[in-house]
Structures are given as structure tokens and as C-alpha cells.
């Protein structure tokens, strides 16, 4: 149903998370043969983006992830899913093109709410069968990326809150 040449056995999914532009992070989850491969999950602190810019954040993490895999000679996934619509997808796809791997790795965007699937260079969304297995699988993977990213974001936010509260106490905080 996803119009792929081969059934994907190795899938990676990306999700960004921030609170009004602060503590921007992203997550990459990896599924192999339909099961989470938690040891391969990755968190990313967004380094190059100030404020709220999901597209720039997506470009940064996709570039960091796949330039590293290429450098290490690590096999690329059979499918990349980005949490988001056309904008996030085209940001990620642009990076894959720049790295020279856009023709080697299929990529889709999955927009929440209507569960629309977007393909590069196609302005119209594709709707998978609501009861079909492909939609259930990619939604499960996307939701896992979201959960993993939100958990990391909360940890980072909580840690930053504690640090800043202690820093403001005279004699305890930074000198």
C-alpha cells in the first residue's frame, strides 16, 4: 500500500519536540522486522536552530543521522518516516538529496489527525486504508518516535528547570 519496491525490514522515524522554541530536541526510533530496536534509538539536542523552526530542526537531525551512517559505512534503512506533513518531508528529502542518497532510501511524511501520507515531489496526500496493516504499523512507529522524543524533552526541561532554580539561590548557585 505504501508503493515501495520492497517490503521495508529496517525503518527509521524522526520526530521533533520543543516547548515554544525552548529545549528543542528530536528523536529517531528504529524498527527492524516490525519490532522496536531500542538499542538503536537516538536522541538529538537541536544545536543549529534558534526558536521554533521544525523544518530547520528536521534538516539538522536528518543530516546528522545519515552523514554519520554514511561516514561509518552503516547500512541505510529501507524506509524513513518523518512525523509531519509536506514541510517536514521536503526538509528531510532535501538533505537526502544533498547527501546523494535520496534515490536509495524511500521517505514518507505522516501527518497526524487525518493520518495523511506524503511522498516527495507529490503535493497531494495519500490515504491508506484505515483498517489496513500498513497504516497501523507506520502510525505505531510514528507514535513511538513521538513518545521517545517527548520523554527526552521532558527530562531535559525538568533538568534545566532544576538547574536554573538552584542557580538563582545566593551562595548555592553559580559563583
Question: Where are these predicted regions, by residue range?
Answer:
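Acidic, glycine-enriched active-site microenvironments
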Residues: 1-175
Amino acid at each position: 500500500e505504501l508503493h515501495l519496491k520492497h517490503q521495508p525490514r529496517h525503518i527509521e522515524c524522526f520526530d521533533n519536540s520543543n516547548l515554544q522554541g525552548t529545549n528543542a530536541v528530536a528523536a529517531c526510533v528504529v524498527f527492524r522486522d516490525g519490532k522496536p530496536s531500542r538499542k538503536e534509538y537516538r536522541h538529538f539536542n537541536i544545536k543549529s536552530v534558534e526558536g521554533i523552526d521544525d523544518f530547520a530542526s528536521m534538516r539538522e537531525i536528518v543530516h546528522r543521522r545519515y552523514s554519520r551512517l554514511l561516514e561509518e559505512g552503516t547500512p541505510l534503512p529501507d524506509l524513513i518516516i518523518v512525523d509531519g506533513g509536506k514541510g517536514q518531508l521536503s526538509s528531510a528529502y532535501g538533505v537526502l538529496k544533498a547527501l546523494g542518497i535520496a534515490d536509495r532510501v524511500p521517505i514518507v511524511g505522516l501527518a497526524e489527525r487525518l493520518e495523511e501520507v506524503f511522498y516527495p515531489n507529490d503535493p497531494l496526500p495519500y490515504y491508506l486504508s484505515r483498517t489496513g496493516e500498513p497504516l497501523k504499523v507506520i502510525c505505531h512507529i510514528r507514535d513511538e518516535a513521538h513518545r521517545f522524543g517527548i520523554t527526552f524533552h521532558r527530562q531535559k526541561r525538568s533538568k534545566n528547570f532544576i538547574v536554573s532554580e538552584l542557580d538563582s539561590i545566593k551562595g548555592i548557585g553559580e559563583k
